[in-house]
A protein has these predicted regions:
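Catalytic nucleophile loop of clan PA
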Residues: 152-174
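Helical hairpin unit composed of two closely spaced alpha helices linked by a short loop
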Residues: 141-143
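Long, acidic/polar, low-complexity amphipathic helices and coiled-coil-like
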Residues: 2-7
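Charged, low-complexity helical/coil segments in non-catalytic cytosolic or luminal regions
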Residues: 9-138, 147, 177-181
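Conserved small/polar residues in nucleotide/adenosyl-binding loops
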Residues: 182-189
Length: 193
């Protein structure tokens, strides 16, 4: 997930889940279940093609990690199971949320498990539009971390929701991939934090 609070509320993706049709409409869902998954493949992105990650979702009682209660244009939201929250809380760092006026161009990091373990990858925030009409595209990012470029080509489909950290604070999440660049860029949302 992009974030979770100390009481287990989570937000993820940074964009909603679509209905699977060409209309691009949101899937109507006011309840659902969240399950763990295992990353099984990475299709490297390149200019003109976004790349993607693939995985296997494990369904069943032992793999259930939470419940979903909202699917919106800004992401999915819900409640982590108490066992899952205890496990995450023991391992993770809590970050304060930056105010809009604290976000600036320059270095930042994305947190992702794309390598199979939770890691931080270096980014550069290249543009900020604090008046963006599309709340899911408030800034542009460029991957500067050679490890991520080597692994996936940059930001790829399936990395939506990866939190973006700047100056020790969470400033948003990866939401979209732009394929017109050699090292794939991402757009970010911060309105849902």
């Amino acid at each position: 997930s992009t974030y979770y609070t100390k009481d287990g509320r989570f937000g993820a993706l940074g964009h909603g889940i679509g209905d699977g049709t060409q209309s691009g409409n949101l899937l109507y869902a006011n309840s659902g279940d969240l399950y763990s998954m295992k990353l099984t493949k990475i299709k490297k992105g390149k200019a003109g093609a976004p790349g993607e990650i693939g995985g296997v979702v494990y369904f069943g009682k032992k793999s259930h990690i939470g419940t979903l209660d909202c699917n919106s244009n800004l992401g999915i939201y819900g409640q982590l199971d108490s066992d899952e929250l205890s496990e995450y809380a023991a391992e993770d760092t809590y970050y304060p949320v930056a105010g809009k006026d604290e976000i600036h161009t320059g270095s930042a990091q994305m947190i992702s498990e794309i390598s199979g373990k939770l890691e931080k990858y270096n980014l550069e925030i290249t543009n900020i539009d604090k008046k963006a009409t599309d709340t899911n595209k408030g800034m542009e990012l460029k991957v500067t971390d050679d490890r991520l470029i080597e692994l996936s080509g940059g930001i790829v489909q399936g990395t939506s929701g990866s939190p973006i950290i700047q100056d020790g604070k969470i400033i948003g999440a990866v939401t979209h991939v732009s394929v017109s660049y050699t090292h794939l860029r991402a757009h970010e949302t911060r309105s849902n934090l």
